[in-house]
C-alpha cells in the first residue's frame, strides 16, 4: 500500500467507511475566494461552509485536494529542488467535520489511520498542541498513550490557526515522525527544528472560536474540524526514503526525464531533475484547470514555473524543447485520480512545446540585450537592477543567468533595485487577479438562499409565468417594500427569467400586478442558485408575498438563444478546422452579438475562418432539431459532451445536442455538437438564421477570440458591407468584382512612387548644405577639433536608409564622423552616427549617439563603436542634437 495512488485511495476509503462523503478536488483557481491566487489547502472549497454562509448536504467530508504554492503569501518556488520536502504542487489529504464530531473523534480517527491502516510505529511519532490546549493533550494521552514528553506544547501561531483577522479560528495539533538520527534536525520547538529529521505530515485544526474583533474571541456554537495531510510526505514516510523526490511517483517522472535526455542525474545536477519533475506537475495541472502562461496574475506565476523548469532542462543539455515530451509520464501516473489531466493532455503538451520554443528564442535575445546594456561597464561596476528585471520580466531572462553572464567580467547586479522592481510587479500581479466565484461579503444573498432555498427556473419551457415575491433588497439590505422610482432587487419563488451564467447575459422584461410594474434590467445568480431580478419600480409599490405576472422580453431572448446556439456550432467547427486541442476559455452571449474565447497558439488565417463559418452555416441550413437531456455528469462526459474548463458541475447535468450529420470520426450518437450547458437555445438550428464571423483577435497568450453575429444582425452587417463595397467601387470607377484588381494596381503604383520619392530624398540629403532635403539648412562637412564632421538634419528618411547614408558618408569622408538626424511626420527624431575605422579608438559612435539622444528626449541608444543609432520624441531639436555631437567631438 506504499504507492502514492494506494495511499490516496486508502485515506479516502478509510474516511468514507467512517461516514464521510468523498468530495472531488476543487480547481486550482479558487471559485469562491478572491483573496487567493491558487487553491493552497483542502479547506479552501469549504470556506463558506465553515463561516456559515453555505450549507452542504453532508456534515462530514474527505478530499484529496490538488494545491499549488508558488505565489502570494505561500510561495515555495525558490526552494523546490534544493530541499527534501518543498514542492510547488502537492496533494493535501483531509477530513472535515462541519459541526459534527470534534476534537476527541478527530484525534481518534487520525490515530487509527496512521497506526492501523498505514502501520506507523508509535515510538517514532510525537505531536504538538497549542500551549493552552489541555483538552487536546489529554486526548492524545488517552487515545495514543503518549507521555508528556511526546506531547510538545507550542505557544506560537504555528499551533493556532485563523482564517483571517476575524472569523473561525482555533488551536491545532501537528503530528510528526522521527526519520532517524542520520538526518539533521531536532524536535519542534528546539533550536534545530528546521532540520528534516522530525517531519510534520498531518495538521489537525480544531475550529472552536470566532474572532469577533482583535481583542474579542467567542466560542463557536458548533465547533468544526479541518485537517490536512501532505500525500507526498506520507509516501516519503511509508516508502522509507529521505526525500519526497525519492518516492515512486517522482522516481517515475525523473526516469522519464532521464530517458528523454539520454542520461541520468549526477550529484552536481540532481536538483535540476527534481525541479523539472515538480514543475511538470504544477504546470500541467494549472494548464488543465484553464491557466495559460502570460505576463500578469496567475498566468505570470505559471510562466515563472514553466521557464524555471525549462532553464534547468537547458542546463542539463536539452537541445530541443523537453517538458512537453514528459507529459505522458505524468498522465500515466496521475490521470486515473485526476481525469482532467487526460482530457487536457494534448493542450498541455502544445502549450509547453510553444512556451519552451519561445523561451529559447528569448534566451538568445536576452543575451544580446545584456551584451548591449553592459557594453560600457568595466570590472567592479554594478549592473542596473531595473534593467536586470526588465530582462527577466519582459524577455524571460532569469536573474541567475544575468549574474552568471556578468560574473566572468567581474560585474555584479544591483539586487536591491531588482527586488524593488520585482515587488512592484508582484503588486501589479496581485491586483490583476480576481476570484471566479462570489465574494463571501455578499452575506445578504447567502442568508436569503438559506431561508428561501433555490429559485425554480421555468425559462427552458416558457417566457411568461406567475410568481410570488419572496424577498426585496435595496442597497444590500432586505426591505419590506419598493415604491415607484425605487431601484432594487426582487427574489421570486419561481421565474422564467434566465440569470446570467455560462457567458449568457441575464434576461430583461417586466414584472407586473395589480397597480404595480417593475422593469427588470438584469437578472443575476447569487449564492449559487438564487435568481435575483434587478431593476426599477415604474408604478405602485411592491411588497413581499405579492403575486406578479412575469414576462421576459421575447425578442431579446430569441436573439440571445440564436447567439448561444451559434457559439456551440462555432466551437465544434473550430475543433474540426484547427484540431482537437481547441478548448473553450470563455464566451459572451448577448442579444446583438457573441464572442467565443478558446485555446489556440497562433492567429487564425482568413481561409480557416471562412471554413469555420461555412461549416457552422451548413448546420444552420440543415435545420436540425436541437435537443436537451438531463444526464449523469460521468455519463455525459463518457458520451463525448464537451465541458468548460474550471466550471463546476453537479451530479446531473443538462446536455445540449445539435446537428445529426456525422461529419468526422469524433461525432457521437447524441449529435454533431454536444456540450454541457445550462443556457437557453433555439428549437432548430435553422432558427439561428445566419452566422457571420466579424472578427478574430488575441486576448491573452495562447487564447484567441472570434466575434460573430447571427440572424437579423448578421443580415444587417452583410447588407452594410455590400453597400460599402458598392460605394468604394464607384469611387474607384470600377465594378465590385473588379475592385481587388483595381486596388492591387493602385497599391503597386503607390509603391513605385514611394520608392522614387525615397530615392529623391536620399539624394537631396547627401547633396550638400542648403539642399532641399535639409530640415533647416543643416551644416556641410566641417572640421571640429581637427576631425571632419558631416552633420545634417533631414526629413522623411527611415532609419534603415539613414544607416546606408551614413555608410556612404563614411566613404566620402575617408576619415571622420557622420551624424544624420531624421524627423518623422509625427515629430519624433531618429539619429544614426558613424565613425570611420581610424577614429574608433578616439570616438565611440555609441557614446556620441547617446549624447544626441538625450537632447531629443530619449534615454540612450545602442550599436557598435563604428555605427550606432538612437531616437527621441522631440525631433524639433534635431539641430541641437547635432550641435551636442559637435561639442562632444571638440571637447
From Swiss-Prot:
CC cofactor: Zn(2+)
Family assignment from sequence similarity: Belongs to the class-II aminoacyl-tRNA synthetase family.
Name listed for the protein in its UniProt record: Alanine--tRNA ligase
GO cellular component, one term: cytosol
Pfam families named in the record: DHHA1 (PF02272), tRNA-synt_2c (PF01411), tRNA_SAD (PF07973)
Main location: cytoplasm
CDD domains xref list: AlaRS_core
Catalyzed chemical reaction(s): tRNA(Ala) + L-alanine + ATP = L-alanyl-tRNA(Ala) + AMP + diphosphate
Co-factor binding details: Binds 1 zinc ion per subunit.
Domain comment (free text): Consists of three domains; the N-terminal catalytic domain, the editing domain and the C-terminal C-Ala domain. The editing domain removes incorrectly charged amino acids, while the C-Ala domain, along with tRNA(Ala), serves as a bridge to cooperatively bring together the editing and aminoacylation centers thus stimulating deacylation of misacylated tRNAs.
SUPFAM superfamilies (UniProt xref): Class II aaRS and biotin synthetases, Putative anticodon-binding domain of alanyl-tRNA synthetase (AlaRS), ThrRS/AlaRS common domain, Translation proteins
Residues holding Zn(2+): 564, 568, 677, 681
Assigned EC number: 6.1.1.7
Name of the encoding gene: alaS
NCBIfam families: alaS
Alphabetized UniProt keyword annotations: Aminoacyl-tRNA synthetase, ATP-binding, Cytoplasm, Ligase, Metal-binding, Nucleotide-binding, Protein biosynthesis, RNA-binding, tRNA-binding, Zinc
Listed InterPro entries: aa-tRNA-synth_II/BPL/LPL, Ala-tRNA-lgiase_IIc, Ala-tRNA-ligase_IIc_anticod-bd, Ala-tRNA-synth_IIc_core, Ala-tRNA-synth_IIc_N, Ala-tRNA_ligase, Ala_tRNA_ligase_euk/bac, DHHA1_dom
Function: Catalyzes the attachment of alanine to tRNA(Ala) in a two-step reaction: alanine is first activated by ATP to form Ala-AMP and then transferred to the acceptor end of tRNA(Ala). Also edits incorrectly charged Ser-tRNA(Ala) and Gly-tRNA(Ala) via its editing domain.
Amino acid at each position: 500500500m506504499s504507492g502514492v495512488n494506494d495511499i490516496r485511495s486508502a485515506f479516502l476509503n478509510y474516511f468514507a467507511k467512517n461516514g464521510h462523503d468523498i468530495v472531488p478536488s476543487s480547481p486550482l483557481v479558487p471559485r469562491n475566494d478572491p483573496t487567493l491566487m491558487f487553491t493552497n489547502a483542502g479547506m479552501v472549497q469549504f470556506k463558506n461552509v465553515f463561516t456559515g454562509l453555505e450549507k452542504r448536504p453532508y456534515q462530514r467530508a474527505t478530499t484529496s485536494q490538488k494545491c499549488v504554492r508558488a505565489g502570494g503569501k505561500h510561495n515555495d518556488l525558490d526552494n523546490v529542488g534544493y530541499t527534501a520536502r518543498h514542492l510547488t504542487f502537492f496533494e493535501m489529504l483531509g477530513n472535515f467535520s462541519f459541526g459534527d464530531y470534534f476534537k476527541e473523534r478527530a484525534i481518534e480517527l487520525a490515530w487509527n489511520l496512521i497506526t492501523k491502516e498505514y502501520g506507523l510505529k508509535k515510538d517514532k511519532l510525537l505531536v504538538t498542541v497549542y500551549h493552552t490546549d489541555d483538552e487536546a493533550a489529554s486526548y492524545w494521552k488517552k487515545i495514543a498513550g503518549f507521555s508528556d514528553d511526546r506531547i510538545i506544547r507550542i505557544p506560537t501561531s504555528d499551533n493556532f490557526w485563523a482564517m483571517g483577522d476575524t472569523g473561525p479560528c482555533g488551536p491545532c495539533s501537528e503530528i510528526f515522525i522521527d526519520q532517524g538520527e542520520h538526518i539533521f534536525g531536532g524536535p519542534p520547538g528546539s533550536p534545530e527544528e528546521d532540520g528534516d529529521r522530525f517531519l510534520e505530515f498531518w495538521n489537525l485544526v480544531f475550529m472552536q472560536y470566532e474572532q469577533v474583533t482583535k481583542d474579542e474571541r467567542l466560542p463557536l456554537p458548533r465547533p468544526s474540524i479541518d485537517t490536512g495531510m501532505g500525500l507526498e510526505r506520507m509516501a516519503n514516510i511509508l516508502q522509507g526514503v529521505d526525500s519526497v523526490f525519492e518516492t515512486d511517483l517522482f522516481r517515475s517522472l525523473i526516469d522519464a526525464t532521464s530517458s528523454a535526455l539520454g542520461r541520468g542525474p549526477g550529484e552536481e545536477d540532481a536538483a535540476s531533475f527534481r525541479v523539472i519533475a515538480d514543475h511538470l506537475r504544477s504546470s500541467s495541472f494549472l494548464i488543465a484547470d484553464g491557466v495559460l502562461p502570460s505576463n500578469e496574475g496567475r498566468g505570470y506565476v505559471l510562466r515563472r514555473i514553466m521557464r524555471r523548469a525549462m532553464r534547468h532542462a537547458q542546463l542539463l543539455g536539452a537541445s530541443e524543447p523537453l517538458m512537453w515530451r514528459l507529459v505522458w509520464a505524468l498522465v500515466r501516473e496521475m490521470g486515473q485520480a485526476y481525469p482532467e489531466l487526460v482530457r487536457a493532455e494534448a493542450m498541455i503538451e502544445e502549450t509547453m512545446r510553444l512556451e519552451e520554443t519561445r523561451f529559447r528564442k528569448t534566451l538568445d535575445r536576452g543575451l544580446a540585450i545584456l551584451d548591449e546594456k553592459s557594453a560600457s561597464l568595466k570590472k567592479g561596476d554594478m549592473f542596473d537592477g531595473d534593467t536586470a528585471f526588465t530582462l527577466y520580466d519582459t524577455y524571460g531572462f532569469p536573474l541567475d543567468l544575468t549574474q552568471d553572464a556578468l560574473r566572468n567580467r567581474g560585474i555584479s547586479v544591483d539586487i536591491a533595485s531588482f527586488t524593488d522592481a520585482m515587488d512592484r510587479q508582484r503588486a501589479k500581479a496581485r491586483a490583476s487577479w480576481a476570484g471566479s466565484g462570489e465574494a463571501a461579503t455578499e452575506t445578504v444573498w447567502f442568508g436569503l438562499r438559506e431561508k428561501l432555498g433555490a429559485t425554480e427556473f421555468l425559462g427552458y419551457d416558457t417566457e411568461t409565468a406567475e410568481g410570488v415575491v419572496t424577498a426585496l433588497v435595496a442597497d444590500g439590505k432586505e426591505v419590506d417594500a419598493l415604491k415607484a422610482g425605487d431601484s432594487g432587487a426582487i427574489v421570486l419563488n419561481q421565474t422564467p427569467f434566465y440569470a446570467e451564467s455560462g457567458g449568457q447575459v441575464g434576461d430583461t422584461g417586466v414584472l407586473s400586478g395589480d397597480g404595480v410594474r417593475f422593469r427588470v434590467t438584469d437578472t443575476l445568480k447569487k449564492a449559487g442558485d438564487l435568481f435575483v431580478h434587478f431593476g426599477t419600480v415604474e408604478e405602485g409599490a411592491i411588497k413581499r408575498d405579492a403575486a406578479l405576472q412575469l414576462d421576459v422580453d421575447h425578442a431579446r431572448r430569441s436573439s440571445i438563444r440564436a447567439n448561444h446556439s451559434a457559439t456551440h456550432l462555432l466551437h465544434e467547427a473550430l475543433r474540426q478546422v484547427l484540431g482537437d486541442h481547441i478548448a473553450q476559455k470563455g464566451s459572451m452571449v448577448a442579444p446583438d452579438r457573441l464572442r467565443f474565447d478558446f485555446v489556440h497558439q497562433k492567429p487564425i488565417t482568413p481561409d480557416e475562418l471562412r471554413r469555420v463559418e461555412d461549416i457552422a452555416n451548413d448546420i444552420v441550413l440543415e435545420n436540425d432539431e436541437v435537443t436537451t437531456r438531463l444526464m449523469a455528469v460521468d455519463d455525459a462526459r463518457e458520451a463525448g459532451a464537451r465541458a468548460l474548463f474550471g466550471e463546476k458541475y453537479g451530479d446531473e447535468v443538462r446536455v445540449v445536442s445539435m446537428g445529426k450529420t456525422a461529419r468526422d470520426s469524433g461525432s457521437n450518437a447524441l449529435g454533431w455538437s454536444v456540450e454541457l450547458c445550462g443556457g437557453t437555445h433555439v428549437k432548430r438550428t435553422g432558427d439561428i438564421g445566419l452566422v457571420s464571423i466579424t472578427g478574430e483577435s488575441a486576448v491573452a497568450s495562447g487564447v484567441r477570440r472570434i466575434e460573430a453575429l447571427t440572424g437579423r444582425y448578421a443580415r444587417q452587417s452583410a447588407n452594410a458591407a455590400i453597400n460599402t463595397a458598392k460605394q468604394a467601387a464607384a469611387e474607384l470607377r470600377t465594378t465590385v468584382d473588379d475592385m481587388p484588381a483595381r486596388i492591387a494596381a493602385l497599391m503597386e503604383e503607390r509603391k513605385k512612387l514611394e520608392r522614387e520619392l525615397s530615392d529623391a530624398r536620399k539624394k537631396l540629403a547627401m547633396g550638400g548644405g542648403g539642399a532641399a532635403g535639409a530640415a533647416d539648412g543643416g551644416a556641410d562637412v566641417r572640421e571640429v577639433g581637427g576631425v571632419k564632421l558631416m552633420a545634417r538634419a533631414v526629413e522623411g528618411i527611415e532609419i534603415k536608409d539613414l544607416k546606408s547614408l551614413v555608410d556612404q558618408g563614411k566613404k566620402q569622408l575617408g576619415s571622420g564622423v557622420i551624424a544624420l538626424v531624421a524627423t518623422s511626420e509625427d515629430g519624433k527624431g531618429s539619429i544614426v552616427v558613424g565613425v570611420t575605422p581610424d577614429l574608433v579608438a578616439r570616438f565611440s559612435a555609441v557614446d556620441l549617439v547617446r549624447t544626441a539622444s538625450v537632447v531629443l528626449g530619449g534615454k540612450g541608444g545602442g550599436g557598435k563603436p563604428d555605427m550606432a543609432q538612437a531616437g527621441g520624441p522631440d525631433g524639433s531639436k534635431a539641430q541641437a542634437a547635432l550641435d551636442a555631437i559637435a561639442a562632444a567631438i571638440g571637447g
